[in-house]
Amino acid sequence: MPPPPGPTAALGTALLLLLLASESSHTVLLRAREAAQFLRPRQRRAYQVFEEAKQGHLERECVEEVCSKEEAREVFENDPETDYFYPRYQECMRKYGRPEDKNPNFATCVKNLPDQCTPNPCDKKGTQLCQDLMGNFFCLCKDGWGGRLCDKDVNECSQKNGGCSQVCHNKPGSFQCACHSGFSLQSDNKSCQDIDECTDSDTCGDARCKNLPGSYSCLCDKGYTYSSKEKTCQDVDECQQDRCEQTCVNSPGSYTCHCNGRGGLKLSPDMDTCEDILPCVPFSMAKSVKSLYLGRMFSGTPVIRLRFKRLQPTRLLAEFDFRTFDPEGVLFFAGGRSDSTWIVLGLRAGRLELQLRYNGVGRITSSGPTINHGMWQTISVEELDRNLVIKVNKDAVMKIAVAGGLFQLERGLYHLNLTVGGIPFKESDLVQPINPRLDGCMRSWNWLNGEDSAIQETVKANTKMQCFSVTERGSFFPGNGFAFYSLNYTRTSLDVGTETTWEVEVVARIRPATDTGVLMALVGDKDVVLLSVALVDYHSTKKLKKQLVVLAVENVALALMEIKVCDSQEHTVTVSLRDGEATLEVDGTKGQSEVSTAQLQERLDLLKTRLQGSVLTFVGGLPDVQVTSTPVTAFYRGCMTLEVNGKTLDLDTASYKHSDITSHSCPPVEHVTA
């Protein structure tokens, strides 16, 4: 075996080879991580020239002939590689024979022993390259891999979420950023941006679309709920949720609670429960036990009936104090049968009128001042010899010659019937018809020298027979009844053939005691409320407590106007309806329309059609209708006078009037002292 080259020669050869290699090699740039792996503080074979030299020595020393461990040490020039090589070298000889056997597998086995990357111990999937070291090796890992053999996945997501703004998914040797639902991954593959789903008009269908971070919401108006299946807003039937204490009516997007107004109830501030309708203005309701109210019986029948019997001929003497604002009615009747002899003292146009019939011959006389001014005055009727004398405040206003006396002889006794506040027979039997109903008050009466003391005891025991101590002009509605008329609101114009025109003009002068109640209404067949004007203390659609006057056709409010109900003052409510027009005014201020022009015309057309049928005009309340048929069903409480189509309504001429309603007198507001 030739001697190995000396150290100086070997070093020179190595430097020359290194020089040649540096001239001919291409520049190689490694990433920082790869470079760092190469610069580990361990001895490495950095240059290929040393490997080639080592292989030459190895072939000469250990392949062509058997080498000892010391000779192998001279080849590798270090202990680690020698210690690694020599036991494996001996294993190659055991498996393939000695060098002199010339087995090619032996040569291959020996030549591969110094290269510790053959076979490659590094994980193939995670290794970029294997670096042979002195008795060792180094696995240069690909990005995302670690460990000695590059077989350990690096979890990039464990450090700052891998740089992902939302979701980091670790994968073998890698990772991937992802976004939550409703976000999209941007071009940097790390950032996420919200997706605006509302840019697609079909996202929510009929509902409003509101974009949210990573999502969206389909919104409906209050009272509606969104159906994701049909992509529409569907009405919520709140009435199925038992929200109302009494009656509930569902409507698109809302609901309305109703209370039994005729039972004295209205909606509470929560708009769901009911509460009592209580007066907010106190009226002076005190009555006098020494007074007799003449208007208690709407039928026109007398409130008092007396029958006198005498053994001797007797003359009539009647005296009383009287007070009224009523222009017409009967004070009292005295006499016998309708076809015999009698007198009726009444009022017509505010003046005293005497109708009399003696022996079948009737007469009428009227004289004296107007006395329906609401002040007390003393009236007397005295039967003298062949004369009747009528006085007002002791002044004679009438003196009528008569033939005979009012007491009639019958079965040996002289009889006289006397009735107060009405007549004992039909109006048609009068000399001239008169409305017998009289809203008047009588006191200090004296019939035939006081032989009627029982009347006073009867009046004391019955407050309905008593008068208010103080009254003013107007009609008083106590809140528990109504009146109605049969009025016509249509007419056929001769100028345009048979075309039917209609008009409803209402002027109501009111001084309310409560904030809820029907002022007037038109009611058709089957108790359908065609039109109503009423006080109400809430706005039904806005569900807001507010004192209002409402004009409605059936259950649809056409107009609303605010009113100070509880200020103790008189207010004027004006309503005008005709083709194409519906207005509501309170104290000269026009109300706000609640419907569109098309909706208004639709309601007016319906009203016009209904007015051509049977219609009753109700004042102060309604019959027993459904609470849902009109905005208000409660009775009105307070003072009111009413004009309809230019004519003042006289409650004495109504088709019906509740007996507690006073036609021409109203108690004043009670002034409460602090």
Swiss-Prot record:
Residues spanning the signal sequence: 1-27
Domain of life: Eukaryota
Disulphide bridges: C62-C67, C117-C130, C122-C139, C141-C150, C157-C168, C164-C177, C179-C192, C198-C209, C204-C218, C220-C233, C239-C248, C244-C257, C259-C274, C280-C566, C441-C467, C639-C666
GO annotation, cellular component aspect: cytoplasm; extracellular space
InterPro entries named in the record: Coagulation_fac-like_Gla_dom, ConA-like_dom_sf, EGF-like_Ca-bd_dom, EGF-like_dom, EGF-type_Asp/Asn_hydroxyl_site, EGF_Ca-bd_CS, GAS-SHBG-PROS, GLA-like_dom_SF
UniProt xrefs under CDD domains: EGF_CA (cd00054), LamG (cd00110)
SMART domains tied to this protein: EGF (SM00181), EGF_CA (SM00179), GLA (SM00069), LamG (SM00282)
Cellular location(s): Secreted
One Pfam family this sequence matches: Gla
Ranges where the Laminin G-like domain occurs: 295-467, 474-666
Domain spans labelled Gla: 50-91
Glycosylation sites: N189, N417, N488
List of residues binding Ca(2+): D326, E328, R437, D652
Modified residue annotations for Phosphotyrosine: Y636
Record PTM Phosphoserine, positions in chain: S68, S614
Subunit structure, as described in the record: Heterodimer and heterotetramer with AXL.
Entry protein name: Growth arrest-specific protein 6
Organism (species): Rattus norvegicus
